Structure formats: C-alpha cells, structure tokens
Amino acid sequence: MTDERVSADGGMETSFGFRDVGTGEKQPLVNDVFHKVAKRYDVMNDVMSAGLHRVWKDAMIAALNPPRRENYRVLDVAGGTGDIAFRIVEASGRKAHATVLDINGSMLAVGAERARKKGLLGNLEFVEANAEDLPFAANSFDAYTIAFGIRNVPRIEVALKEAYRVLKRGGRLLVLEFSEVEMPLLDRFYDAWSFNAIPKFGKLITGDEAPYQYLVESIRKFPNQRDFAAMIRTAGFGRVSFTNYTGGIAALHSGWKI
C-alpha cells in the first residue's frame, strides 16, 4: 500500500495531511513545517504524544539493544535533533557510531549543537540528504532507525528500499511511528485530543497552528500497522513484526535484511 497515486490530470500525487498535492510538492511543504518547529521539536513531540514519546523511544532503543563495540554503525533517518542517535550512542557505552540523516538543515543544526553540549560529536555524523536517495554505499550499516519520520516521506516505498540497500546482511530496520489506535474508547479520546487540543497547544508554544494541524492529519493518512508491515515485506525485509505502544497510538515496526 502506498499513498502515491495518479491524479486526474495524469500526474502523480500524494497526501500532505488531508490535502492532495503533487508528489514533487510534498517535500518542500514538509520542509517548511520542520523549519518552523525545529527549535521546539521535542516540545512538539511532548504535545503530540502527551509526553509518551520519551517512553516509546526508550523502548525502541531497548529493542535495538546496540552492542558495546566501536564498529557498530547505525543510520538514524529523519533524526535531525539527535534524540534517537544520542540514546543509541549512550546505550552502547559510547562505542557505537551513529549517522544522523535529515533533509532539513534547521533540524540538523539543532542536533549538532545538542551533540556538542553532550560531548558526543566524536560518535556522530550529521548528513543533510533525502531518505529516498541515501548517499551511502550498499551494505554500510548494522541498523537503520527512523522515529516519527517515515510518514513525512513522499514515497515511503522508495525510502524502505533504500533502507534495505544500505543495511548489511543481518542488519535491522526499526521504525517508530504514530499508528492506528486499536483500543476501544481510547481511539475517541485520542481523536478529540489530536484535532481539538494539539493544534491549539501548538499555537500557544510556537505561535503557529498550521504545522501541528498537518502533523495530526499526517498520522491519520499513514497506513495502519498491518498495511505498513506489508510495505516493509515488499521492500525485501524478513522477520517483519510490530509492537503496539499505548493501545496503538504508536507502533514499533521491525524487519531484518536476511
């Protein structure tokens, strides 16, 4: 399942929130959203998840369980502010090397400054590039992680194929993403929170409601857990599975390059 489709005029289109846009138009629109929220990105995630993103990210790192060896290489995509990469490096006893890739320079600038303050620059590399066209050789990384970023990629299936390409044989893909709530009653509460509260809190925090409105809508347009797992299999991964967090508000997807 992919959100990309043929438009009425014969071109390719995809979704930007609840809007239909040309596939080539989505990335600049997404970039604008994250330029606006870069300095308040962690606060944004607190608003989007009621603070639970921190628990989910810790669970993601526990699932990865990075070894304490210096030649362990991780690619963290859409990881500009470094939140996942920092956790991976610390969990490895500051042995692992993480490449933080993001298409948004504002997000990377925030991450690099945070890494400097934490004394982690020796374990990290920051690369501005597109998830659909990774600037790395095949079989380069032991793990590929992406947290709350895959739904913003215009062509998700292309990004997944690139993930498969750059992973070493035996390498692991981990995708943490907002998902479809599967717990009765929680889905109603979460819808009310998402569409009524989140944009208003976003406006209070940043002075701009629009980025938060897009982010809420983008969650609803993202494939459900089973459909996204099928996309991961189609990209070539084996042993594909997912784990729901907080009743399905988020899900951690796992796949291996076998």
Curated annotation (Swiss-Prot):
GO terms assigned for molecular function: 2-methoxy-6-polyprenyl-1,4-benzoquinol methyltransferase activity; demethylmenaquinone methyltransferase activity
Record carries keyword Signal: no
Binding locations of S-adenosyl-L-methionine: T81, D102, N130, A131
Coiled-coil features, chain-numbered ranges: none
KW Secreted (keyword) present: no
InterPro entries xref list: SAM-dependent_MTases_sf, UbiE/COQ5_MeTrFase, UbiE/COQ5_MeTrFase_CS
GO biological process: aerobic respiration; menaquinone biosynthetic process; methylation
Signal peptide residues on this chain, from the entry's feature table: none
Similarity comment text for this entry: Belongs to the class I-like SAM-binding methyltransferase superfamily. MenG/UbiE family.
NCBIfam families attached to this UniProt entry: MenG_MenH_UbiE (TIGR01934), PRK00216.1-3 (NF001242), PRK00216.1-5 (NF001244)
Protein name: Ubiquinone/menaquinone biosynthesis C-methyltransferase UbiE
